[in-house]
A protein has these predicted regions:
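Conserved "HGTGT" condensation-loop signature of ketosynthase/thiolase-family condensing enzymes
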Residues: 1-114
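Active-site-proximal alpha-helical scaffold in enzymes
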Residues: 117-126
């Protein structure tokens, strides 16, 4: 069984910077983390986590953005009842210096990440 799983994973990788999936990927969970202004808006009740501190307890906006990314990933993993090591790839991006907040925020999860550099189009590209 382990050998078959290893072969399947190897078949997904094509070249040094591209992958091809044998089975189409799909979304099994999602999470949203916002600041107080978003939480007070008309969609407020739909967010998974709303912080009353717009800097999420961090010293800088950059660190706050990283914390938001990390919290969203941790919440999504929890909702799906899976562990970070069960995730093969993470596709992520942000509006801050083309992915620095995302890469720093999810670093501790140790999930291989594809950085998406499209600002607002990141969600559509993923």
């Amino acid at each position: 069984m382990e050998q078959m799983e290893q072969r399947k994973q190897t078949e997904q990788i094509r070249g040094s910077q591209s992958i091809v999936f044998t089975d189409a990927p799909y979304i099994i969970s999602a999470a949203s983390v916002v600041g107080s202004k978003e939480g007070e808006g008309p969609l407020g009740k739909f967010f998974d986590m709303t912080s009353q501190d717009d800097q999420f307890g961090e010293k800088t906006w950059e660190e706050a953005e990283s914390t938001m990314q990390k919290e969203a990933c941790v919440l999504a993993l929890g909702k799906a009842r899976i562990k970070a090591e069960e995730i093969r790839y993470l596709f992520g991006g942000d509006l801050l210096r083309q992915g620095v907040a995302t890469s720093m925020g999810v670093e501790a999860l140790q999930i291989p990440m594809f950085g998406l550099f499209g600002a607002c189009s990141t969600s559509g590209e993923a």
